[in-house]
Amino acid sequence: KLHPLVMLNISDHLTKALMDINESPVYVLLNPTINHAQKKMLNSRIRVLHQYLGSMQK
């Protein structure tokens, strides 16, 4: 089971990722107006979400 502070951090990442993406991940990655730094940040947040969801399945 994850520590409550870790859960808060994950929840924060989830909220930010959903607010930042606001579109499908494919749109974000293909949108030429989104710069490399933004894509990198979004990818890191998506990675955190993926790890979180994976841990919830165990």
Swiss-Prot record:
Q: Which domain of life is it from?
A: Eukaryota
- Subcellular location, record wording: Cytoplasm; Nucleus
A GO CC term attached to the entry: COP9 signalosome
Main location group: cytoplasm
Enumerate the UniProt keywords alphabetically: Cytoplasm, Developmental protein, Nucleus, Phytochrome signaling pathway, Signalosome
GO BP, sorted A to Z:
red, far-red light phototransduction
Function comment = Component of the COP9 signalosome complex (CSN), a complex involved in various cellular and developmental processes such as photomorphogenesis and auxin and jasmonate responses. The CSN complex is an essential regulator of the ubiquitin (Ubl) conjugation pathway by mediating the deneddylation of the cullin subunits of SCF-type E3 ligase complexes, leading to decrease the Ubl ligase activity of SCF. It is involved in repression of photomorphogenesis in darkness by regulating the activity of COP1-containing Ubl ligase complexes.
Family, per the entry? Belongs to the peptidase M67A family. CSN6 subfamily.
Q: Additional info?
A: Although strongly related to metalloprotease proteins, it lacks the JAMM motif that probably constitutes the catalytic center. Its function as protease is therefore unsure.
**Subunit and partners:** Component of the CSN complex, probably composed of CSN1, CSN2, CSN3, CSN4, CSN5 (CSN5A or CSN5B), CSN6 (CSN6A or CSN6B), CSN7 and CSN8.
Please identify the protein, giving its name as recorded: COP9 signalosome complex subunit 6b
Q: Which organism is it from?
A: Brassica oleracea
Q: Which gene encodes it?
A: CSN6B
